[in-house]
């Protein structure tokens, strides 16, 4: 089980606290320091059953300057997320063949039961 974490993000810290309070202690990966490989991000997207655009933080300045209004393919969007990991939505928990975005944190329980 892996929790993709940004320790500078309050919501990400809250998500990790939520898991720990439920006695769930995943491996923590600080994805801004330990960048995802292309195949890892594709696997996460498959497990989330999401398209790349759905996993992007659209309020980030980099989204507005590099992506908004452009017709990019899914592969191009994935490459942008690898290049600019701040674009990746926070609070992702991967467990086995499933993944979930913890917004709200209670969503984590859907793959832990």
Describe every region a protein language model picked out.
Residues 1-18, 26-31:
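Local sequence-structure signature of Cys/Sec-based thiol-disulfide redox active-site neighborhoods
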Residues 22:
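Conserved dinucleotide-binding and phosphotransfer motif residues
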Residues 33-113:
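Thiol/selenol-based redox catalytic cores and closely related redox-interacting motifs
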């Amino acid at each position: 089980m892996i929790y993709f974490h940004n320790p500078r993000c309050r919501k990400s810290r809250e998500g990790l606290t939520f898991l720990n309070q439920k006695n769930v202690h995943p491996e923590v990966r600080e994805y801004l320091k330990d960048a995802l490989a292309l195949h890892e991000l594709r696997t996460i997207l498959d497990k989330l059953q999401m398209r790349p655009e759905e996993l992007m933080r659209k309020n980030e300045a980099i989204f507005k300057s590099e992506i908004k209004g452009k017709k990019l393919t899914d592969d191009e969007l994935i490459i942008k997320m690898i290049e600019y990991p701040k674009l990746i939505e926070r609070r992702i928990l991967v467990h086995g063949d499933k993944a979930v975005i913890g917004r709200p944190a209670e969503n984590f329980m859907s793959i832990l039961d």
